[in-house]
Amino acid sequence: WHANANPMARLCHHGGTGGTWVNKEKEYMMYTNDNRIVMTLDAGGTNFVFSAIQGGKEIADPVVLPACADCLDKCLGNLVEGFKAIQAGLPETPVAISFAFPGPADYQAGIIGDLPNFPSFRGGVALGPFLEDIFGIPVFINNDGNLFAYGEALTGALPDINRRLREAGSMKQYKNLLGVTLGTGFGAGVVINQKLLLGDNAAGGDIWCFRNKKYPEYIVEESVSIRAVMRVYAERSGDTGVHTPKEIFEIAEGICPGNREAAITAFSELGELAGDALASAITLIDGIIVIGGGLSGASKYILPALLKELNSSTGMMDGSRFGRLQMKAYLLEDAESFADFAKGGAVEVPIPGTNRKVGYDPCKRIGVTVSKQGANRSIAMGAYVFALNHLSKGI
């Protein structure tokens, strides 16, 4: 508290030689060789899945117990039972417990608020202090959007992109990231220069409640979620049956019968409205956008509309037009797009009064990519590294 790889199944800083990021990547390599053990939890509304990580690898067979979300005593009892079962099979004593849990919550204090999917959590449940009293080790709780972003920033997309840029001969290195999960809801987390943005009210990165571009009276999550894909497909196709996003994706692919145009539109509309929200968010963050979650498996239909929205234009009353973003957004999954992203617009400019020149890249740019390690892995690694970082700093 101190506060799915199968996509459809889980359906600019100029750093000189990039030395700062090389050091950060070496720092992560230290974690992969770290012998400290952290117990983790995947907290779903139906089941709890317990495990443990050492050196960046899962070292325990997962233990699965029902969440018992409607009975607080049973829920807390299963949390204790699950962690004790994991602890009993470990080669040494774990140094911490770290996991994601739904909000609202005061994550720093380890107190969980009134949860829609956990009816028994009402009036504030001191989950962190409870577990710390039982196990005698620090407990760190965050939301899944934050831990997804943290995992991608330290162990996933960000170090991978910076490595690829160096290999391409680019001097550009990135240190800021907006992590986005597309699934039951529209989650997000922000990492600025290796630091997770928690916010003064544990609400940092909450993008789900942004205004909806198409339906301004509603939140954007109404158009960026599993329920949105299902709703739009039904509206466009006239099909009164209930179709899951996986089925709608297969209709779009031509694998299953159905209205293919409506299926494609269901995902592209999500991309457009997610792109509108992300354009506002990334204007403040100015970094890499990485997308995960179950719906990211349909990225081929989501990302074109999302990129189009990011690179759209706006204007002034005098008729002037300019980009919605100061930066151009590139799709990093595409080889040609990545090559342009890496190349930028680097030139050399003279230093007045001397014979020397310095490098200058006037091309402001960001990248959009899909998580390669998957949301579950990124969240677990985010929880693991979050705990080790805080323990090392004595927080």
Sequence positions of predicted segments:
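A short local loop/turn or secondary-structure capping micro-motif enriched for an aromatic residue
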Residues: 1, 68-71, 123, 158, ...
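Short hydrophobic alpha-helical segments enriched in small aliphatic residues
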Residues: 3-5, 14-15
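ATP-binding/phosphotransfer module of carbohydrate and carboxylate kinases, centering on a glycine-rich
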Residues: 19-95, 106-109, 133-137, 160, ...
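Phosphate-binding/catalytic loop of phosphoryl-transfer enzymes
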Residues: 96-98, 104-218, 223, 376-395
